[in-house]
UniProtKB/Swiss-Prot annotation:
CDD domains, per the entry: Peptidase_C19R (cd02674)
Key words of the record: Hydrolase, Immunity, Innate immunity, Metal-binding, Protease, Thiol protease, Ubl conjugation pathway, Zinc
Positions of the UniProt region annotated as Disordered: 1-53, 91-117, 130-254, 273-297, 360-410, 500-610
Organism in which the protein naturally occurs: Drosophila melanogaster
Lineage, broadest ranks: Eukaryota, Metazoa, Ecdysozoa, Arthropoda, Hexapoda
Effect after changing C622S: Loss of activity
Name this polypeptide is given: Ubiquitin carboxyl-terminal hydrolase Usp2
Amino acid sequence: MMLDIKKTRGFHKIPQASKLQSTTKTSSVVATSASSQNEVPSPGGSAGSKVGATNPVRAANQRFFLVSSYKDPTFLKAECDLAHAHVTTSKVKTTLQPHRRSRAGEDSRNNNYNTSRAPTLINMRRPSLFNGNQQPTTTNSTTINNTTSRNTTSNTSNGVLKYSVRSTTATATSTSTRNYGKLKPLNNNQTTAGVAMMNGHTNNNNNNTRNSSNINNGGNNNMQRQQQQHDDISFIDSDDPPATGGPEAGISTTKTSICYFKPITPPLQLRHEQNQVQQQEEQPQPSSSKSASHRYPRPKSTIIASAHSNFAASFEKFSGGLYRQTNGETNIESKTSSNARRYGIDSLSIKASIEKFNNLSGQKRQNPGSGSGIGPGSATASGLGGGRLSVASRSNHGSQAGGSSSNLQQRYSSDLDNIRVAAGYSSSLTRAAYRTTATMNSVSTPVAVTSELGGPISGDGGETATAMGQPTSKVTVRGAHSNRQPIECDSVVLTNKASKDATTAATPTVATATATHTPATSSVSTVTVTAAAPNSASDSTLARSGTGSSSTARSVLPPMTPTSSRYWDRDSGTSRSSIGTSSALNSSSLKHNSDDGYKTASSSRDEKSEGLCGLRNIGNTCFMNSVIQCLSHTQELTRFLRSHHGSRSLSTKDQQILHEFAKLIQEMWTANVHTVTPMELKRAFSTKHRMYSDYNQQDAQEFLRFFLDSLHSALNSGVKGETLNIDDNLSDNKKADLTWEWYTRHENSLVRDLFVGQLKSTLKCTTCGNTSVTFDPFWDLSVPLPSSSRCKLEACLDLFIREEVLDGDEMPTCAKCKTRRKCTKSFTIQRFPKYLVIHLKRFSETRWSKLSNIVEFPTSDSELNMGSYGANSNSNVHYSLYAISNHMGSTAGGHYVALCKHPVSRKWHEFNDNIVSDALSENHLVSSSAYILFYERT
């Protein structure tokens, strides 16, 4: 009977089921063999019971999984390293008690070897096939107590491996010889199929005896495992009980068995097996006939973990330290042998991890001034002299060096902190590594400044940090790069640059903050912070005094990405030193004349800390977080959104996007809010733009265009239907004005007023000299990069407006010649927008590579002059840089961060998802990672 398999999958033709028929050989008495081709005879010979016909689908899958051509070494490496194959055999009942030995810690070792030759063979390195399977070529003989076991492995010309095992005992009068089944691969290249004991992975013992499944016998535990490489893999499970032997003892039987696949045992089953071992030790050992009837049901679905990962440490937590790895062996306290390394992640562990993440996320809503006392897992860092600060940091293990975004188990579960995903095999929630080095692998929490009385200062200007997790270390807060000198954390005088004519001097004031502990501590701590602001910021000093006891901040969620020590986690609920030291400045000196939306009547409100809010990465959403941070620091847009109040139940999808974006901006610019999750905004945006419904990496500039278009559509109050009629005899400027007026009547919104400019396109025929001029709106300028490795932004703009020749297929139709002619085309800017967005075209359309040219762009106020690129070259148009979207990585994958200038403090900060850095210098803005530049017209 042939099995019908889909030919489109490229499967090999399934041979007849008769290839797996069983044969029976006897030495003295010939046992009765099974009459069916798919039946497996019992070891008892003629008196053995017949198992019955094997499932044909299972047999087909068994043969398919042995096809070597489908063994792709990169298939599901992170989640499913390999599927275990167990040989279903039956063992002749012996009169001796099998020797027990713990083989839980033996990886890639033959479990048949005992103490006599185990040290030599365990340390011997075996050659492996291309898929990691072992190919033994030797014959070994090993003595195990009273039992002599001899294993013979031979290779046949057609790639079939045969195992012949002969066992003799001192007391038994009969001899039983078993020939293990032939596993014939369905290939044509005569390649030997993978055999037992895959190198570097854990072998699971398959003891087909009458004893309980949780007892390891010293008999022959030959196994065979295959690495599954197809996306439609399914575990072949068998719940049929093993065949029992007959009472005859003097019969020597050789039988053929079949491989099947079985999932790895999860921790829940391990706990169950431990309880069974304890019960068996307390109770008398039952007879073999009774123990053979008990079989623990295997789970149908498990998550398989790699034996090469650091999951052993997490498994010790599951088992309460019962299993502890020492030099390749497993020490089990007063316990018999058990399969301790057969572990995985069960659904309860995942559920517990997610619940823990939800609990930690819920804590961010608490008042930062009211925190619990310092627990055993927290640490408080004290300030060092000279203005340098020492902070307590959570060690960022190598498990996070593979990138930002892993799954919830890896990110938020404290029980799974040591999981290491294999390099290059990332999940859908994994980003590319970001600035991962051996010395820059920890994330600093906000500093804790110690007052003269010994207690850390708390409150609005408080500086108390709590480090959560495993080991803590002291690091020095550094500047924009960790290899530079530490920044002296003195008080900073913020100069108001709203007016060009004068600057506002800061006046020394005193800020008082009160922090209240949780009801559990029943104490109130009042702290006074005094900051003196002299005329020069470089000579400024800070005097601190405090009274009362210390208060702690809430727990800190682990960062999404590996970051250097200069980052301060905004999740801690404490203020940054540059903010806390300058908190004594009068609120009137913090007001920006051109931004009434950032003003406040309350002097206790810390305006400089508003907006310094990180955005959590919910799965490869760094491109969205980077763009949102840049738009959040667009002052007029943020001022409008902070006062915008709409309803969630709006008619259009664009209005829903606007509503969620306004809610997000309002929360980001709320005092004492340091991290926000943009889940609702992404959900609303993905409803309209389905390409963003998944969690794949996307282009930030493309997302910016879609996002601004949705905001414009939600606010658009223009009237449609009017046609544009312009006389060709009018001047270019008059044509431009009429075209712009017509466009604004159709597209009327605040977003258009802020970001849209007008581009003049000139087309000139090289034959007749006829010139055609058109005016089109633009949302951003995508400028090409020159071939030099280092250039200026002006060179990119020159390439953008440079005259281009249209020839060949690009030739347009000349209105005067009435045919296609070779023409020249050039651009100039007719109308400049309020906010100019410049996109550096780093991703080549012809090459699948990223251009890493360093573009030197103006960073100071009013430094960029765009007048020479306008249609009217005699005008001066000045712009000031206020935000940058950086991309690190390549076209295959990377990471986005944002560099933004705070509208109040006028300081630069880096927003790396939920991590916000300290104030940066303008010298650190120019890099080869700059991708989108945001300029404000001054």
